[in-house]
Amino acid sequence: MYIYNCIFTGKEVFSDAYPHKLEDEGFVWVVDGKYEELADQKFDDSLFGGNKSAEGEDDEGEASTEYKPVVNTLLRAFRLEEPVTITSLNDFKKALKKYTVNLMAKLNESNQSRVAVLKSKLPKYAKQWAEDFDKIRVYVTEGDGFEVEGTLVVITQDVPFGEEKPNDKCKMTVLADSLIKEKF
């Protein structure tokens, strides 16, 4: 099994346990995920101060009002966080610029030939993400939600965000040069 870690934070971004492919001549990883219902989590009135015995209610014959959350398998498995500092398109552009500058500096140290690839291919993705900003979500690795010092992870899906149901599909896109492949 291989784990793909952020080159900056060292934290997990994804693993080969999920369907994935290297696209655009090795520029981006696209990872397939889905939404699933958390069967082990139960939410009922007791979480919010409800006490059926004190209220004089009888459990018999009452319909269950349990809530089972639907979660993104990629976000859950790798503990990706939505950065609190990216709330608008302008915030996203600033974060992407900072990320790009940091990635180019890292590539200048380790693999200078990839800087030209980054400069030539990234504008296409940046333009698409900016145009579709209301249809994407940006995530970072665990613990990077405030500083946003590491890899930016873009999630897209076929259904509007907030309307997910079990088995709805999603895709993660991440720049290949911002990851380190590690055998686990």
From Swiss-Prot:
Keywords: Calcium, Cytoplasm. One of its GO terms (molecular function) is calcium ion binding. Concentrates to the body column, with no detectable protein in the head and foot region. It is found in: Cytoplasm. Residues 1-184 form the TCTP domain. InterPro entries: Mss4-like_sf, Mss4/transl-control_tumour, TCTP, Translation_control_tumour_CS, Translational_control_tumour_p. Pfam families: TCTP. GO terms for cellular component: cytoplasm. The keyword Calcium applies. Belongs to the TCTP family. Involved in calcium binding and microtubule stabilization. This is Translationally-controlled tumor protein homolog. It comes from Hydra vulgaris (Hydra). The lineage of its organism: Eukaryota, Metazoa, Cnidaria, Hydrozoa, Hydroidolina.
